[in-house]
Amino acid sequence: DLVVYTDYDKDADFGGYKTYFLPDSILEAGGHRATYWKDENAKAIINKVAAEMDARGYTRILDPEKKEEANVGLQLSYVAQTTQVITGGYWGGWWDYGFWGPWSGWYYPYPVSYSYNTNTLVMEMVDLTADEDGTQKNLPVVWYASASGFQYSGQFNQMMLQNSVVQAFEQSPYIKSVN
């Protein structure tokens, strides 16, 4: 499973929010330019977030032209990373004569390398009502969640990402609209 971390603004009035805007794509961070993940796997994650918000009494604004009418906005970001590790290697010349045979003499150690893949899904909720007059440059993040861990292939990884969305909302019972 992915490790899920959540945090929130203790002063935010989650019960006062009624509507939310959630884009139809996930920002893929990590390159020189922003790219957007829009395939059926991205849509499944987005739909899972929408279902969690809807279940808590919020109404989704689907039309991007009307997103300024939303009380909160959700931004989903995804980062996949490969880490390459190269160690100094094994020398091989320190074994006892009686156990491994005679000392083999000195030679350069061969390097040992391996790599592993990780991925992180970040969910941020911003208060869009904080900029009623249109002058605020930075909107306050009222909820933050990240799910990180090893990246697996195919549907198993997709299932873990969707499960992490559910876990993030389970860890955040304060996200609930009062209608």
Task: Report residues per predicted region.
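C-terminal/domain-edge helix-coil "capping" segments
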Residues: 1-4, 9, 113-142, 147-179
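Soluble periplasmic/extracytoplasmic beta-strand elements of cell-envelope proteins
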Residues: 20-23, 73-77, 122-124, 143-146
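Solvent-exposed loop/turn segments at secondary-structure junctions
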Residues: 27-29, 79-83, 129-130, 148-152
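Post-signal peptide N-terminal segment of mature Sec-exported envelope proteins
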Residues: 2-24
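Sec/Tat-exported extracytoplasmic proteins
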Residues: 24, 49-57, 78, 129, ...
